[in-house]
Amino acid sequence: MSEEKFDAKVDKVSGSVKESVGKLTGDKEVESEGKVDKLKGHAKEKLADIKDTIKGASESFKKKD
């Protein structure tokens, strides 16, 4: 797993925890921060996937040369 994907997973997990804590304590701010962290994690993960796809395509073209 790449460092970027690991960071994305950390953001998603910490976001889920924050969101749950916010819900349990009734703290809407913490709950919202958790949702933002989860979305940030999803975005990082998608970006890492795109980078991996581009890297794979680039390597395929290099092999053809």
Swiss-Prot record:
Residue ranges, compositional bias (Basic and acidic residues): 1-12
SUPFAM superfamilies for this protein: Hypothetical protein YjbJ
Domain of life: Bacteria
InterPro entries reported for this sequence: CsbD, YjbJ_sf
Pfam families xrefs: CsbD
Ranges where the record places region Disordered: 1-29
Family per record: Belongs to the UPF0337 (CsbD) family.
Protein name: UPF0337 protein SAG1136
Organism: Streptococcus agalactiae serotype V (strain ATCC BAA-611 / 2603 V/R)
Source species taxonomy: Bacteria, Bacillati, Bacillota, Bacilli, Lactobacillales
